[in-house]
Amino acid sequence: MGQCVTKCKNPSSTLGSKNGDRDPSNKSHSRRGASHREEQVPPCGKPAGDILVNGTKKAEAATEACQLPTSSGDAGRESKTNAEESSLQRLEELFRRYKDEREDAILEEGMERFCNDLCVDPTEFRVLLLAWKFQAATMCKFTRKEFFDGCKAISADSIDGICARFPSLLTEAKQEDKFKDLYRFTFQFGLDSEEGQRSLHREIAIALWKLVFTQNNPPVLDQWLNFLTENPSGIKGISRDTWNMFLNFTQVIGPDLSNYSEDEAWPSLFDTFVEWEMERRKREVEGRGTLSSGQEGLCPEEQT
């Protein structure tokens, strides 16, 4: 896998529209003037000359209404927008710190510096969790979109902020549904998308199985990985179906493999594994029996 897991939003007026009582002495004057001129309508749509009870002209009140300060809700939205803009600026600065000089992405060298600043090893489980949250498509690479969307997903815009999210990510990965999503992501993550791979190389699959089961190591995992390691010629690659079904295998098949049935719809590689493991255990038992038989005919001094 190389040196890293990841390739590692117009305030409205607060005044009502009701007209105030008019001064009775103004009635005749208003009628006489109506035929000579039209009332001027100010920008807020209030007829000029209308007087409120407190003596203020409606036009003036309307103008003041247009100039009222924003409501607390508008101020809150503005504050939120400013905070989002500041966060985006910090993310931009953080991304530029690690991005490649030619490509608008964080590549292997930048990834190593990123992990170093996070105080994590590029090959450890926490980096896989980060790649999962970033939905990284390729090992040792974060595109701009992956980096920005991922940091937003975990509500972090700084090195300290990302580090502070690790404990909650580790806890989240222990949930059955979340782990299943992480597990399936890991297969796709291990593929070389640029080469159009459809199956994992055996060595990559072994490393990723060890990594993804960091917090919950099933009893049969070690035997499974030994089988893959000792039979390189018979295993060209690990398909998506085999990868996905292995999680089911660890959940329903006991460590002694006694409840495994070839009649069920398991991948053929599982049949081969169970047969291989049973033979290995048989030889192990026979070997212990032979050793015990050989020691029975020896004198106490010879046994020691």
Swiss-Prot record:
Q: Which Pfam families match?
A: Cullin_binding
Where does the record place the region Disordered? 1-87, 284-304
- One GO CC term of this entry? nucleus
Which residue numbers delimit the DCUN1 domain?
86-278
Q: Which domain of life is it from?
A: Eukaryota
Location of this chain's protein in the cell: Cell membrane; Cytoplasm; Nucleus; Cytoplasm, Perinuclear region
- Protein name (database record): DCN1-like protein 3
Tissue specificity statement from the Swiss-Prot or TrEMBL entry: Highest levels of expression are in the testis. Very low levels of expression in the heart, brain, skeletal muscle, kidney, liver, spleen, lung and ovary.
The text the record gives for the protein's domains is:
The DCUN1 domain, also known as PONY domain, mediates the interaction with different cullins. The DCUN1 domain mediates the interaction with the N-terminally acetylated NEDD8-conjugating E2s enzyme leading to the NEDD8 transfer from N-terminally acetylated NEDD8-conjugating E2s enzyme to different cullin C-terminal domain-RBX complexes; the neddylation efficiency correlates with the DCUN1D5-cullin and DCUN1D5-E2 interaction affinities. This domain is also involved in CAND1-, cullins- and RBX1-binding.
Tell me one GO molecular function of this protein. cullin family protein binding
Q: What Gene3D superfamilies does the record point to?
A: Cullin, PONY binding domain, EF-hand
Q: Give the quaternary structure.
A: Part of a complex containing DCUN1D3, CUL3 and RBX1. Interacts (via the DCUN1 domain) with the unneddylated cullins: interacts with CUL1, CUL2, CUL3, CUL4A, CUL4B and CUL5; these interactions promote the cullin neddylation and the identity of the cullin dictates the affinity of the interaction. Interacts preferentially with CUL3; this interaction triggers the relocalization of CUL3 to the cell membrane where CUL3 is neddylated. Interacts (via DCUN1 domain) with RBX1.
The reply on keyword Transport is no
N-myristoyl glycine lipid attachment residues: G2
Source species:
Mus musculus
A biological process (GO) of this protein is: negative regulation of G1/S transition of mitotic cell cycle
Ordered alphabetically, the record's keywords are: Cell membrane, Cytoplasm, Lipoprotein, Membrane, Myristate, Nucleus
Q: What does this protein do?
A: Contributes to the neddylation of all cullins by transferring NEDD8 from N-terminally acetylated NEDD8-conjugating E2s enzyme to different cullin C-terminal domain-RBX complexes and may play a role in the cell cycle progression by regulating the SCF ubiquitin E3 ligase complex, after UV damage. At the cell membrane, can promote and as well inhibit cullins neddylation.
